[in-house]
Amino acid sequence: MNYNKFELMEFDLNKMVIDPSIVMIAKRGSGKSWIVRDVMYHYRHLPCGVVIAPTDRMNSFYKYFFPDLFIHYEITEAILKNILLRQQMIIDKQKQKKKQGLKIDPSGILIMDDCLSQKKNWSKIQEITEILMNGRHYRLTYVLTMQTPLGLTPDLRLNFDYIFLLKDDTQVNKKKLYNNYAGMFPSQLAFEKVLAKCTEGHKCMVIDNRKPADKIQDKVFWFKARDRKFSFGAREFKDMHKKYYNPEYGRDRYRKLMEGEDVLFGLKKNDTNLKVNLREIPTH
């Protein structure tokens, strides 16, 4: 086997675990929101969700495919408590309906895009830890984007199922990424070479944190977001937006609706000649 030449497969979103926790790390303007959008396209069938994105107040990125009523610009303890409360209520309701032979999809999604600027307001909120530690029990898919590798405490960083790393030309950040997320590589040089290859042409590296594997190829992948046209959420979710959203007076007065029942929601150390090939998912 040639340890200095191997192929990395394209990451298949369809193979992610149910209700995953995902972190995306990249500097501002790197295109991570487009990757978030592709992930949301993958989960567009989910009945409901919440987006918290401080920068969306200015760039209005999410409004084109996600109901404005459920997009927030500031993270608060109340929002997170309501999300978990909604999940608990709908899961209980699902159990009741199941006894009647009926089905309810209790799953939802929470997007927190570049919220670290408000870190003092949320980093110690108990609900964040609860979502990361037990989000799967709440049937909640969680996506967090951040600009710095060390934006979270070590105990929280270890609880993400999938890590998306985008292009970063800062040596200090690349060292932090290697030390804190990419320990499966035999050296920092090997990691940097693979990262550089994976992030060519607006692609990114994906690390499967749930898969124990001896071979890097079984744990590390590449991914490129596609331009998607879609509308997220169930009909009831969109209908609630149409009924209650009032752009003239804002949305704060409607946040209590989140509690409602209807839409509650192996290489060697000789790395200098390392060659990496990227393979696409076969089309059928």
Swiss-Prot record:
InterPro entries: A32L (IPR006758), P-loop_NTPase (IPR027417)
Pfam name, any one: Pox_A32
Stated name of the protein: Uncharacterized protein L437
Record organism: Acanthamoeba polyphaga mimivirus
